[in-house]
C-alpha cells in the first residue's frame, strides 16, 4: 500500500475521457467498507503560481507509483510525456534531434499526442515508457504497433503484457557476474538488445589481428581477465557470500583514486555494479559512463543538501527519478531518497501551515474591520449625543424664558384685576 508522504500519480480524465496521470502525494490512508482509500494532494500546480487544487479521496485503483524513465526511445514507441505541468499523457515518438546547449548536447524528441494528434517537442527528461500498473507490478506496452509486422493476427489491445513473463531473461557474457536483486528493466533490455547484441569473446572478430598487432600485451591481459571472470562465475552459486563483484570494465582511469578519496565517498560508501552498462554502452565507453555516474551521484547529493523550501516540486521529483536511475546500477540511494521523501512531507506540512496562516490572517483582518466599523459608529453616536445635548440646552433655556413670561403675565393679570376704579 502507499504510506503517507509517498509520491504517487493519480489518474484523472480530461478531454472526453483521456486519462492523465497527475503527480500527487499521499496524505492519509484509511479503510472504508473493507476497501483502502487514500487522501491525496495534487502536486502538479503547487509551485507554478496557480491556485492549489483541494485534496481529494481516491481508491487504490486510481493510484500508481512513479515509474522510471530510460536513456533512449525508439521511433514509433509508445511513451508518456509531461505536458504543461499538468500530468503525464499518452504519446508516440515520431523522431528525435540532438541539440547543443552550451558545451553539452541534449536529445529532444518529437512526440505526437494520441488524444489530439498534435506533434510537440519534448526533452528526454519529460518522456517515460508507457506502462500499466496492474496487480502491484508494471506491465509494459509494446513499443511498436503490431501492424508493422507482416502476417500477425494479434490486436493492439493484446500488446499489454507482463514484461517479466514474456521477455526472455538477459544472459550476461561469460565471466560477468550480475549481482542478485539488481535486474535490468525489461523495457530497457528490449531496446538495447534491438540495437546491438551483448559483447562476446573478441578473438573471433575480423579486427582481432589488427588489435593484437597494436597492443598484444593488452589482449593477453584481457584474455587472462576473462578467464578469471569465468572462474568466478562458475562458483557464484556455490559461494554467494564470498563472491567478489566484478565490474563490466577494467578500472584504468586515475580519477577513481580521486573519487574514492573524496570525503563524501567515505561518508556514503558505494559499491555500484554497473551491470546495465553491458547492454547500454560499448565496451570502450563503459568506464567513462561509470565515472560519469559516480560524479552524478555526488552532485545529486549536493543538490539534495542545497534544497530550499520554495524549490518547485518538479525539482524534487526529478531528483527522485535520477536516484532511481542510479539505483539500477547498484548505487545505494536509500538515504537520499528517504531524505527527499521527508523533505516533501515537510513541504506539504509547510503548505498546510501556510494555508492555515492565510486563513487566520483573513479572520483577523475581518475582525479588525468590524472593530473599526464599530468604533466609527461609536464616534458617530457620540457626535449625535453632543448635538442632542446642545439642542436640549437650547430647549431648556427657551422653556425658562417662557416660564418667566408666564409669571410676568400672571402678575400683570393680578395687578389689573385689583386696580381701583
Curated annotation (Swiss-Prot):
GO-annotated cellular components: nucleus
Disruption phenotype annotation: No visible phenotype under normal growth conditions.
Ranges of compositional bias, category Polar residues: 149-165, 199-213
InterPro entries linked to this entry: Agenet-like_dom (IPR008395), Agenet_dom_plant (IPR014002), DUF724 (IPR007930)
Keyword Cell division: no
Subcellular location, principal: nucleus
Domain of life: Eukaryota
Region Disordered, residue ranges: 149-229
Keywords: Coiled coil, Growth regulation, Nucleus, Transport
Tissue specificity field: Expressed in leaves and flowers, and at lower levels in roots, stems and siliques.
PANTHER family: AGENET DOMAIN-CONTAINING PROTEIN-RELATED, DUF724 DOMAIN-CONTAINING PROTEIN 1-RELATED
Record's function text: May be involved in the polar growth of plant cells via transportation of RNAs.
Protein name per Swiss-Prot or TrEMBL: DUF724 domain-containing protein 8
Organism of this sequence: Arabidopsis thaliana
Amino acid at each position: 500500500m502507499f504510506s503517507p508522504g509517498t509520491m504517487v500519480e493519480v489518474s484523472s480524465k480530461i478531454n472526453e475521457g483521456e486519462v492523465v496521470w497527475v503527480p500527487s502525494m499521499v496524505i492519509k490512508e484509511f479503510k472504508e467498507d473493507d476497501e483502502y482509500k487514500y487522501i491525496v494532494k495534487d502536486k502538479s500546480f503547487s509551485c507554478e503560481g496557480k491556485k492549489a487544487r483541494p485534496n481529494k479521496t481516491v481508491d487504490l485503483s486510481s493510484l500508481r507509483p512513479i515509474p522510471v524513465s530510460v536513456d533512449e526511445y525508439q521511433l514509433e514507441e509508445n511513451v508518456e510525456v509531461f505536458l504543461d505541468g499538468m500530468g503525464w499523457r499518452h504519446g508516440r515518438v515520431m523522431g528525435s534531434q540532438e541539440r547543443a546547449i552550451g558545451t553539452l548536447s541534449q536529445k529532444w524528441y518529437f512526440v505526437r499526442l494520441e488524444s489530439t494528434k498534435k506533434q510537440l517537442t519534448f526533452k528526454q527528461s519529460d518522456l517515460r515508457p508507457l506502462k500499466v500498473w496492474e496487480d502491484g507490478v508494471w506491465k509494459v506496452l509494446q513499443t511498436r504497433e503490431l501492424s508493422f509486422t507482416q502476417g500477425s493476427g494479434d490486436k493492439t489491445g493484446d500488446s499489454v503484457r507482463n514484461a517479466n513473463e514474456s521477455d526472455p531473461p538477459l544472459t550476461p557474457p561469460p565471466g560477468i557476474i550480475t549481482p542478485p536483486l539488481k535486474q535490468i528493466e525489461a523495457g530497457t533490455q528490449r531496446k538495447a538488445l534491438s540495437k546491438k547484441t551483448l559483447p562476446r569473446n573478441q578473438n573471433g572478430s575480423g579486427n582481432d589481428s589488427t588489435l593484437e598487432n597494436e597492443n598484444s600485451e593488452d589482449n593477453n591481459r584481457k584474455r587472462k581477465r576473462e578467464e578469471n571472470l569465468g572462474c568466478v562465475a562458475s562458483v557464484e552459486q556455490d559461494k554467494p557470500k564470498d563472491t567478489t563483484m566484478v565490474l563490466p570494465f577494467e578500472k584504468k582511469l586515475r580519477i577513481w583514486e580521486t573519487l574514492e578519496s573524496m570525503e563524501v565517498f567515505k561518508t556514503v560508501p558505494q559499491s555500484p555494479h554497473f551491470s546495465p552498462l553491458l547492454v547500454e554502452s560499448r565496451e570502450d565507453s563503459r568506464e567513462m559512463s561509470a565515472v560519469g555516474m559516480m560524479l552524478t551521484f555526488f552532485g545529486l547529493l549536493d543538490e539534495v543538501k542545497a534544497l530550499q523550501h520554495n524549490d518547485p516540486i518538479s525539482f524534487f521529483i526529478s531528483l527522485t527519478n535520477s536516484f532511481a536511475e542510479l539505483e539500477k546500477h547498484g548505487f545505494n540511494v536509500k538515504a537520499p531518497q528517504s531524505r527527499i521523501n521527508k523533505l516533501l512531507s515537510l513541504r506539504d506540512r509547510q503548505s498546510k501551515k501556510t494555508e492555515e496562516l492565510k486563513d487566520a490572517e483573513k479572520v483577523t483582518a475581518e475582525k479588525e474591520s468590524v472593530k473599526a466599523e464599530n468604533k466609527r459608529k461609536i464616534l458617530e453616536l457620540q457626535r449625535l449625543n453632543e448635538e442632542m445635548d446642545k439642542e436640549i440646552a437650547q430647549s431648556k433655556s427657551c422653556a425658562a424664558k417662557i416660564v418667566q413670561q408666564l409669571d410676568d403675565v400672571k402678575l400683570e393679570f393680578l395687578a389689573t384685576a385689583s386696580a381701583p376704579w
